[in-house]
Amino acid sequence: MVNIVGEHATAHLRYDAPLKSDIEGLARPLSHWIRRTDTAHSLAGDAAMAVRAARPGRIATLILPGETSWGEAGNAELPPLLSLPAKPAPSTARVEQVAKVLLSGEPTLIVFGGTATFGAAPEHAGRIAAKTGCRLATQFFTARIARGAGRVPLERIPYAVPQAVKFLQAFRHIITVETGEPVAFFSYPGMPSLLKPEDCQVHPLIDAGEDSVTGLAMLADALDARAAQPRLQERNRQPAPQGALNPTSIAHALAAALPENAILVDESLTTGRETSGLTAGAAPHDVLQNMGGSIGFGTPVATGAALAAPDRRVFCMVGDGSAMYTIQSLWTQAREGLNVTTIIFANNSYQILKTEFANMGFGEPGPQALAMIDIDRPRIDWLAMAKSMGVPAVSVATAEDFHRRMIDSVKEPGPFLIEVKL
């Protein structure tokens, strides 16, 4: 990603005008590369350098003083074209050490992140699992996962600390691929920060920035697993659910409605807690998740996904509290005619904050605490909100209606919003 940030003209900065700020100081914690362009003449070259620096997974910030918009560029100086260096493979010693662990017969889990959760990497991992009996999983939050029928299934380490500890308690070895060892998202009284057992060893195999496809192929070769047949997810064609809306019926309806090659943006938090397991056998799709713990990630990411892949339908699952942060994304979707189905789970509360309140041992929140996390005074009219931004919308109160409306949303191009009343 390249961020281009405008600044006052250089000569104007000395007057401490409004909007003057330490842009570099603000950008530094969030950028891998920062440059301030001095003249219009150097702008083209600096922009090219920013693009080069902003390879996948990295952020470049280019600061442009006002005079770069009106100055004479002349013959712009461009840097020579250079191809990006190939990702390095992990060391042979690391691969051989991990191979010994997998051949030891002790319970082992491989945890994947980064670019290792889609493309060819999971296929190599599936062969390794078929050969050795190890299990494959992702962190609870993973940027992108290829899921669905015909793909190598990856388990998901639970979010809640007690469930995560239980999930990991049987393993004596954890192998990491483009991620670190599992840790709790927050610290809670009386609960551990490290989720693995004390006698469980962690073995880094592939670091972030290294080539997971090559590294896992090397490991498969070291295990003589290239010919092994990975277990692939079977298609689960359950009938569409009927009756009341709850996390289970919502997940079943979604699994039945997802078209092939869809993109599922998941910021459903509490209501979507059953989605991961119950959509595993849906049609092949990609899941995009929030990596930073922010609120309001869903609708902008769905907008970007639809712009990047206009031939694929995007489903965005988002809570009503989260959606209020970035609901203006609907206007962009309408303006650009983007193929996004936004699903608003309307429980009229920041339910995730109530859960975290309870996790701290505070019990039930009182009136003052509830006043900060309930959003029902006034209650948000999501249909009117969507209509005001040019997006058609419906409200559903049963599982069968929810399923039918998701199917209908795919039949016509452009954005659509479904309010799920809870």
Describe every region a protein language model picked out.
Residues G6, V177, D266, G319-D320, ...:
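Active-site flanking residues adjacent to catalytic metal/cofactor-binding acidic residues
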Residues H173, I263, R313-F315:
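Structural motif
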